Amino acid sequence: MTNKKFKSGFVAILGRPNVGKSTFMNHVMGQKIAIMSDKPQTTRNKIQGIYTTENEQIVFIDTPGIHKPHNALGDFMVQSAYSTLRECDVVLFMVAADEPRSTGENMIIERLKKAEVPVILVVNKIDKIHPDRLFEIVADYTSQMEFSEVVPISAKQGNNTERLIDTLSEKLDEGPQYFPEDQITDHPERFLVSEMIREKILLLTREEVPHSIAVTTDQMTRDEETGKIHIMATIIVERKSQKGIILGKGGDMIRKIGKMARRDIEIMLGDKVYLETWVKIKNDWRDRKMDLADFGYNRDDYM
């Protein structure tokens, strides 16, 4: 019988786009709950991942990459990321070891200097650099502000992630178990389905298309005869030309998106899935507050 006290708390993961925040959280959770691609601003909402052991529960908040916004959607994403500073117990400031400190990192650092909670510097992607460079990178960041801890990791390979979990546990206070031990995210299945479809579009399309799409899951029902889950989803674009790209020649692209998304959705749900997708044009939806709210990007939820 153990006398160890149960610890819990909320941990925000902040950083520029593409530094590996979602990769880290998916690794810790042991399955995909945050989508990934090489496109900037892949994560748009705050994604909560729940890591529970016998002695602790850490609720990770994977935030959108902080960048200079160019539309109302971008502004929503940045405000969503910064709002986590008001609701977390620890901040992980994640940077990429293979990229030099930029104005983006400097902007985040200025905000973090005002944080009233411990800030841990996480140097990710150490597998991409020579070990001798690590000291130089850490020295550069620690010259800008004081961090409570510095932990180098490779989220992709899983290197040193256990040490980071141990470090977080040390920073957290005793607290309750906020979520059931078998729950790994607070987002509903429909949200995760939409995100998995959007991920495949990010992977398969280029130029302006990835940033111009939203996905809504309109219906999820089980077919009593086949046992399959019937999902109806809508892909929203801003231009007629973008709709043509999503559909592809003879519908090739939309079929490819559906096939790849269905595979991940079936793994997540543990059931066979029939996925039906439609493409709808909504001109300039990223700058319309009503459309943003309809598609799940409601700024009031993050204020």
Swiss-Prot record:
Family matches, as Gene3D superfamilies: 3.30.300.20, P-loop containing nucleotide triphosphate hydrolases
GO biological process: ribosomal small subunit assembly
Region of interest (G4), residue spans: 124-127
Subcellular location: Cytoplasm; Cell membrane
Keywords: Cell membrane, Cytoplasm, GTP-binding, Membrane, Nucleotide-binding, Ribosome biogenesis, RNA-binding, rRNA-binding
KH type-2 domain boundaries: 205-283
Membrane topology designation: Peripheral membrane protein
Ranges for region G2: 41-45
Function: An essential GTPase that binds both GDP and GTP, with rapid nucleotide exchange. Plays a role in 16S rRNA processing and 30S ribosomal subunit biogenesis and possibly also in cell cycle regulation and energy metabolism.
Protein's recorded name: GTPase Era
Species per Swiss-Prot/TrEMBL record: Lactococcus lactis subsp. cremoris (strain SK11)
Name of encoding gene: era
